[in-house]
Regions:
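Active-site helix of classical SDR
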Residues: 125, 161
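Conserved glycine-rich Rossmann-like NAD(P)H-binding loop of the short-chain dehydrogenase/reductase
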Residues: 35-54
Length: 254
């Protein structure tokens, strides 16, 4: 499931977290997993915060709903002003427009995926790095995909954006090491969410992905590979990366 020990582990119990894209799928599972581990406060954010009303109502005083579109600098600035106590930043929000690189009609999907999957997390890391430093270092979790490490042509532009986000994660890890911030790359295989509805089973339950990510935080791990698909592909990439690439190259855009 995981690789490589990072900075000292962070305890979830009693911590303050911010989760992007918290209204459904893995993001909602993150909120539930943080609650189960005793987080003191969870800023649950989404572009449409009304979709978080039920969570905030059930967990008054702990779950705080927050309007946040990570492609909008003004939203990020507002969140950084309002959430000065954050110790754990979970960059979960993302999109998959299921587009190829050449087969797509234009570059719109590729640009949108880079904006949300790369520039959004980068902007969040930049805004919250000083906040994490002021609160003892804390941790950043970047939800990526095993496809950050190898391209699946049917989702070609998604894979490119996730590869960029993996490189971002490594760079941010290096820059924030001196302030004691753990930066975790989470790279699952297919997860059973609306975003991956067209991907064939087996798919990992989103709750399992969130739990594995938080296990990584509490163990001080830099890379986490939730589920059998991710761990198997990671081993394949270590042994014969070209063979994995050739195998995935058969899955072309429709």
């Amino acid at each position: 499931m995981s690789l490589q020990k990072g900075n000292p582990a962070m305890e979830i119990k009693g911590s303050v977290a911010l989760v992007t894209g918290a209204n459904r799928g893995i993001g909602r599972s993150f909120v539930e997993a943080l609650l189960a581990r005793g987080a003191a406060k969870i800023y649950a954010s989404a572009r449409r915060p009304e979709r978080l009303a039920d969570l905030a109502e059930r967990h008054k005083g702990i779950v705080v709903s927050l309007k946040l579109d990570i492609t909008q600098p003004a939203d990020i600035s507002t969140a950084a002003r309002q959430c000065r106590d954050v110790q754990l930043l979970v960059n979960n929000a993302g999109i998959n427009l299921q587009a190829g690189l050449i087969a797509a009609n234009d570059l719109a999907a590729a640009r949108a995926e880079m904006e949300t999957n790369y520039f959004g997390p980068l902007a969040m890391c930049r805004a919250f790095a000083p906040i994490l430093a002021a609160n003892g270092g804390g941790a950043v979790v970047n939800m990526l995909s095993i496809l950050a490490r190898v391209n699946l042509p049917m989702y070609g532009s998604l894979c490119a954006s996730k590869a960029a986000a993996l490189s971002l994660t490594q760079g941010v890890r290096g820059e924030l090491a001196k302030q004691g911030t753990l930066v975790v790359a989470v790279m699952p295989g297919a997860v059973d969410t609306e975003m991956e509805r067209n991907f064939p089973p087996p798919k990992l339950p989103p709750a399992d992905a969130a739990r594995a990510a938080l296990d990584g935080v509490e163990q001080g791990l830099e890379e986490v590979y939730p589920g059998d698909m991710a761990s198997g592909m990671s081993q394949g990439l270590a042994h014969d990366p070209k063979a994995v690439e050739k195998d995935l190259a058969k899955y072309l855009p429709r």
